[in-house]
Swiss-Prot record:
<feature type="binding site">
    <location>
        <position position="123"/>
    </location>
    <ligand>
        <name>Zn(2+)</name>
    </ligand>
</feature>
<dbReference type="GO" id="GO:0009253">
    <property type="term" value="P:peptidoglycan catabolic process"/>
</dbReference>
<dbReference type="GO" id="GO:0032897">
    <property type="term" value="P:negative regulation of viral transcription"/>
</dbReference>
<feature type="site" description="Essential for amidase activity and zinc hydrate coordination">
    <location>
        <position position="47"/>
    </location>
</feature>
<feature type="binding site">
    <location>
        <position position="18"/>
    </location>
    <ligand>
        <name>Zn(2+)</name>
    </ligand>
</feature>
<keyword id="KW-1035">Host cytoplasm</keyword>
<keyword id="KW-0204">Cytolysis</keyword>
<keyword id="KW-0081">Bacteriolytic enzyme</keyword>
<dbReference type="GO" id="GO:0008745">
    <property type="term" value="F:N-acetylmuramoyl-L-alanine amidase activity"/>
</dbReference>
<dbReference type="InterPro" id="IPR006619">
    <property type="entry name" value="PGRP_domain_met/bac"/>
</dbReference>
<keyword id="KW-0929">Antimicrobial</keyword>
<comment type="function">
    <text>Endolysin with amidase activity that degrades host peptidoglycans and participates with the holin and spanin proteins in the sequential events which lead to the programmed host cell lysis releasing the mature viral particles. Once the holin has permeabilized the host cell membrane, the endolysin can reach the periplasm and breaking down the peptidoglycan layer.</text>
</comment>
<keyword id="KW-0479">Metal-binding</keyword>
<dbReference type="GO" id="GO:0030430">
    <property type="term" value="C:host cell cytoplasm"/>
</dbReference>
<dbReference type="GO" id="GO:0008270">
    <property type="term" value="F:zinc ion binding"/>
</dbReference>
<dbReference type="GO" id="GO:0042742">
    <property type="term" value="P:defense response to bacterium"/>
</dbReference>
<keyword id="KW-0378">Hydrolase</keyword>
Length: 151
């Protein structure tokens, strides 16, 4: 099967943080998320990076390609997905591990430096969702992980 060729992103103006909306017991990664996205009719995984429960950062869609993670913003942004984000009852919860949050901070520092002028955004900043399940601005500025009340 031929590898899918995606359009290259002309500019990178934002880095979006998402969650997979999975329970803490579900230690999924790029392979599973790719399968879910393909089952929805997508050509590949929509995120550029996935951060597993143990903090491992996995590459998803090619970093330079247009993603499929934030409608209306895919053409000029990168998508980073944290595995987790809901509790056992399906309610949004900032249940990410310290290893995930450390990896997220490191990755975001790298991406923001690489794509100078880009801004950090949560999926819920541009869509009526609770994703990524926490207050990104508060975490980024104060290192406080608080479940999001947006959605």
């Amino acid at each position: 099967m031929a590898k899918v060729q995606f359009k290259p992103r002309a500019t990178t103006e934002a880095i979006f943080v998402h969650c997979s909306a999975t329970k803490p017991s579900q230690n999924v990664g790029v392979r599973e998320i790719r399968q879910w996205h393909k089952e929805q009719g997508w050509l590949d995984v929509g995120y550029h990076f996935i951060i597993k429960r143990d903090g491992t950062v996995e590459a998803g869609r090619d970093e330079l390609a247009v993603g499929s993670h934030a409608k209306g913003y895919n053409h000029n942004s990168i998508g980073v997905c944290l595995v987790g984000g809901i509790d056992d009852k399906g309610k949004f919860d900032a249940n990410f591990t310290p290893a995930q949050m450390q990896s997220l901070r490191s990755l975001l520092v790298t991406l923001l430096a690489k794509y100078e002028g880009s801004v950090l955004r949560a999926h819920h900043d541009v869509a009526p969702k609770a994703c990524p399940s926490f207050d990104l601005k508060r975490w980024w500025e104060k290192n406080e992980l608080v479940t999001s009340d947006r959605g």
